[in-house]
Amino acid sequence: MFTIIDNKYKNVLYTGLSLEERTSKLVPSNRFVLTENYATTPQVGNMKLDKTIHDFIYMTWKEVKRNRDDILAKTDWKDLPGYPGDDQEEWRTYRQELRDLPQDYAEVEDIVFPTEP
């Protein structure tokens, strides 16, 4: 089974494709991700791939928080005083929106992860 994901917006474009089907749909671009034979569970927005039913399902709150914490850990350096970029305020806003996810949404199905600056 092949899945094509829009890497920019994290949308699943096609899933459950055969080798022949994916060849005609995959456009060479860095924007699209082709996945197969998953070593890890792909996650797209607030959903993850359930390998038993080969479809995307909503994550649990625990998984959402783990994802959020991973993103925060990987972007910590952008909040340090020595960060060389001129987009530090945008990163701080983005990181605050990530921290606010559990308070801002009542249901995991409604979560919209903020867009990275």
Language model segments and positions:
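A preference for well-ordered globular domain cores
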Residues: M1-P117
